[in-house]
Amino acid sequence: MLALFASIVILPFAFASCNDDETPISSPTPTTNKAECLTDSAKRAMVYSLTDLEGTKGRIYEMTYTVDYKLDEALQFGIDGTTKLRQFVALRLFDKLPTSQLPTLTYDAGCSAFACPDSRSNDYLMGRNFDFNHFALGTTNREMIPVIAVHTAPAGGLKSVSFVDGKFVDYNQGFYTDKNSDLSMLMALPYLLLDGINEKGFAVSVLKLDGLPTKQEDADKPTIFTTVAMRMLLDRASNVQEAIGMLKQYNMCMDKEKASYHFFMADATGDYAIVEYTNADTLKHPNKMEALQGNDTLRCITNFYVSPTMANTMHGINHSDHGKVRYKNLRSGLLDYNYKATPAQAKGLLQIVAQGPNDSQSSTGFTQWSEVYNLSKRTVSMSILREWGKTFEFGITQKE
């Protein structure tokens, strides 16, 4: 029998707060850290506006991205991986080039996700664990991340909130007030998202796959990277079907040497889909986009291919063990609930498949955050580091 947990409170549309006894933090956190590459006053005001949602712990921050992150230019820049993304940030979003080398920009994502209706209302939910281990170079010493919630409101586009692992631009917990970390790379945040939701109730997340990275090479299509695609979808897609149509217009490239990714998306109409890029010949790069949907077995996802094209490969559903136990537990739990769940039950499912410090030492073996998205109300309830009794509530826009 699945364990149930305290009900997640869905708070009003436009704020973030903590649900324990602490006073919610809403004012910017003071910092003396530099931002060497930024001279524009609006950009500097923005990067100095982060709020530490726990006061001084440095574990979870929130900000509103108020300047233009030039999505149209990003879509035409040929961003095929993290190196090209870093170049775009330096050339298009910085005001001047750094005098020292930029921090390494990396990207990865383990994770579990699912979608289902709320059994007690007409709302639709999406659950998501972001699982990833960061280790100090050459060691098995785990480095702890700062989570950053990023609110965006692009001109002519859709407002959204998305979530970033700050360690992917070399920010550690407490970076914002460590008197050392340069804050310039906060300009990259719109393109570092791992999941998010927009004002139409469309949500998207990314999850890791084993095997060669996706590489599409249609000469008539522009090339985009995983996170650039997700930014585009949150800014411009009102629902799952629009998102699928947008992805078909681009070459997808994912630059991890031995990994690829698939997308899990859902919307406020109850629609959901898994988008994968496939190739039954695993010695070649995946290059065929598939949108998988239409039955309850596709309501959940972990870290192997679910496409029939890949089923009998080493990375497909019939042979891969990467995330298989988590997948079976999600499938079993959703079936027990007849593919419907309350927010508390959805949180319970995330707890069952969460990974702790004594689990796998693989890159995908540690749960950094867990979220229940209410797609109908456009809210997100997040717990970090398996601290299930404490949640942070987010709306599309940040509380003033």
Regions found by a protein language model. Give the residues of each.
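Bacterial N-terminal signal peptides that target proteins for export
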Residues: 1-5
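C-terminal motif of bacterial Sec signal peptides marking the signal peptidase cleavage site
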Residues: 13-17
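N-terminal mature-domain region immediately after signal-peptide cleavage
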Residues: 18-238, 252-253, 339-400
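A recognition module on extended beta-rich or small alphabeta surfaces enriched in W/G with H and D/E
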Residues: 155-167, 307-320
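Non-transmembrane alpha-helical segments in soluble domains
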Residues: 231-234, 244-247, 331
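Secretory/export targeting leaders with adjacent low-complexity proregions
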Residues: 245-255, 263
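Long, charge-rich alpha-helical interaction segments
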Residues: 314-343
